[in-house]
Design a protein with these regions (language model features):
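P-loop NTP-binding core
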Residues: 1-316
């Protein structure tokens, strides 16, 4: 099982978009995936069709009231589950302030996670192959991936995500100011690795909102790759990190689909955004070939993710 925290303390860089659509791509590829929404804004929950209204069980209850993870987890689609967030989560930082070990509450809850049983809660209005109320073997260890969507901060909620994860994915918009914020984020992962979670590693950077036609975007990616190359052989959590070759291009469909409570594959499966996240999922899985991603789409040259070389733009 791979436990991945998707983090960046800057907002609007593609964290939730990447968490949700990568999860959907992996699930459609046959992997069992659970999304944990640790953002008080609950954008990942809304993106997956679960509207936070303050009454539904959520990750807040896991962190503050010691509820089992299985009691709040919902099945969203085939192979895809969600531990939703709620507006109440905004108060968790204060409520947990005096709790010893508050940074590892989520990790301990996942360690105690058992089979869903009666806690299985399918989202109303969705079609599933499995009947509501059926006993499901979906304890934490049965998942292939757990993706945690973090809020735009480096507070106790994000620390919980880092403590409960093995890997970190960093969505990054290719602007120079984003590189300045990256150093603080990497410092935080190093601190967590030293004091809380020695196995934590930064696996990669996902370039989002990419425009291959701008020189700035290309320069930022080049600088980022150069920085990561210099870290090879060091004792830092990012010593083996890479910039994913798949870059998520600007695409209006990616901006539209959250308002419909759908992933890009449910909203616009033939869009460039779907092609990009399909390719990213294949890269995460280590797959190669012309048929990429969960939708088994053949990506046309004009839709294929592009990377820059000395000879121009080529499909990856």
């Amino acid at each position: 099982m791979r436990r991945i925290a998707v983090i960046n303390q800057k907002g609007g860089v593609g964290k939730t978009t990447t968490t949700v659509n990568l999860a959907a791509a992996l699930a459609a590829a046959g992997k069992r995936v659970c999304v944990i929404d640790l953002d008080p804004q609950a954008h990942a929950s809304t993106h997956l069709g679960v509207e936070p209204d303050g009454t539904l069980p959520s990750v807040y209850d896991v962190l503050v009231s010691n509820k089992p993870v299985a009691s709040v987890r919902k099945q969203i689609d085939d192979n895809l589950w969600l531990v939703p967030s709620d507006i109440n989560l905004a108060a968790a930082e204060v409520e947990l302030a005096g709790i010893v070990g508050r940074e590892v509450i989520l990790r301990e809850a996942l360690a105690q996670d058992v089979s869903c049983g009666a806690g299985f809660q399918p989202v109303q209005g969705r079609q599933h192959r499995l009947e509501a109320g059926a006993t499901q073997d979906c304890d934490a260890e049965s998942f292939d991936f757990i993706l945690t969507d973090c809020g735009p901060s480096l507070g106790v909620l994000t620390l919980n995500a880092l403590a409960a994860s093995d890997e970190v994915f960093i969505p990054l918009q290719p602007h120079f100011l984003a590189l300045h914020g990256l150093s603080k984020l990497l410092e935080t992962t190093a601190l967590v690795s030293r004091r809380i979670n020695p196995g934590l590693k930064v696996s990669g950077v996902v370039i989002c909102l990419y425009d291959s036609g701008t020189k700035l975007a290309q320069e930022v990616v080049t600088d980022l790759k150069r920085f990561l190359e210099k870290s090879r052989g060091t004792q830092t959590p990012w010593s083996a990190a890479r910039v994913f070759e798949t870059k998520i291009r600007r695409n209006v469909k990616l901006a539209e689909c959250p308002s419909f409570g759908k992933s890009i594959f449910g909203y616009a499966p033939k869009s460039p955004g779907a092609a990009d996240y399909s390719a990213l999922a294949a890269e995460v899985l280590g797959d190669t070939g012309t048929v990429v991603g969960p939708m088994k789409m053949r990506v046309s040259p004009e839709d294929a993710p592009m990377r820059q070389t000395t000879r121009g733009r080529v499909a990856v």
